């Protein structure tokens, strides 16, 4: 299907038909077979390191960073399912789903507890000073992927930044 060149870039041997995915408020997001393609942004390299760290820690809820394609787009693994887009389906608002989302967030915080925070990775505006972890900062229902009525993934790490774990917890409760 594809291969990595000597620079670690991902190349497709045959262009697969791409499907534009819904969402992607900041950039266009495309699916090509079992991958997602998104344009690179300032800070993408940091997010790629984060995704690699999560994979190494066994956090299977995040997409895997696979490389950069010939069009300078990041290539991520596709998480099968549907995003929690509005209007929410009834099951997405259940107590059981909220408990599973809370577990997923806890596992994320555990996985990033030893992630090295680079000096140039600044907290978001108005973040409280007690930095504990690399917060996702958008752990919201619309970034959670559901399959068989269960949360199976979290996407969109673009605004991840250092902060207190309670910052992520409060935002998740507010948006879920």
Model-assigned labels for residue ranges:
Residues 1-11:
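Short, Lys/Arg-enriched N-terminal segments with co-localized hydrophobic residues
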Residues 16-52, 86-87:
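ATP-binding glycine-rich loop module of kinase domains
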Residues 31-34, 146-152:
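Active-site beta-strand-loop-beta-strand hairpin of nuclease catalytic cores
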Residues 57-67:
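Conserved HxN/HPN-centered segment at the entrance to the catalytic loop
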Residues 67-101:
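Conserved structural core of kinase catalytic domains
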Residues 87-120, 132-137, 142, 146-147:
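Conserved kinase catalytic-core helix
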Residues 150-176:
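Active-site Asp-x-Gly
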